[in-house]
Amino acid sequence: MKKLSVCLLTAVLSCWCAAAFGWGKVGHDAIAYIAECNLTPKAKKNIERYLGGRSIVYYASWMDQVRHTPAYKHTTTWHTNSVDAEGNYVPDPKGDAMTFLDDCIAKVKDYRNQDDSTVRVSIRFIVHLVGDMHCPGHVKYPWYKKYKFSLNGAEYNLHNYWDEWALTLSNKWHYLEYGHQLDRCSKREKREIAQGTPRDWLADSARDCRVIYDWTKADQKLSYEAVSYTHLTLPTTS
């Protein structure tokens, strides 16, 4: 596998995270699908060789599925990133998405000196982590845990809401439909979005995701109109 394959994979994944903006399985599948559609044939072939011929979409939520198993329990904290009040990255001593993503990228780039299983698992992690680091509920500001709200009588915290319900309660699309609706950038726009490093993308994500604390106040009671409002005001790639 050429280094270009992993660089291209992480770059194209970053392009489509802001468009989905609330994850769960459908969101992760949509991000991976759109990214896959923008891979070069050579990069796609190289990646799928390590994945046993499977699509990256197949493994988009794999990291969520294995986090509760004994072998991967140590990855529980590796889905989120903490930032300070100004949105600056604060590394977690227990590990976080950014530290783990950097490690996975380094291993895939060094594929000649890694066994196939290490490269394979690292690719699976990259596909998931680039999505996680762009999700509003996975950017942890200092006041992160204080935010709980009720929506039509059901209580949510922001992590739970943006992980699953932001998509489930708005458009009930399949990941292919998200691909058709959101994969509309020009080549120039794609290049601009994919510029920088994962740490740059985290800084952008922290800045863009802070708005959720303006939309939803702690202990606020909301109706489903709020779901429609957040959906209509989300950034798009069109």
Regions found by a protein language model. Give the residues of each.
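Acidic/His-rich structured neighborhood in mature extracellular/periplasmic domains
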Residues: 69-165
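Conserved small/polar residues in nucleotide/adenosyl-binding loops
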Residues: 230-236
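Bacterial N-terminal signal peptides that target proteins for export
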Residues: 1-8
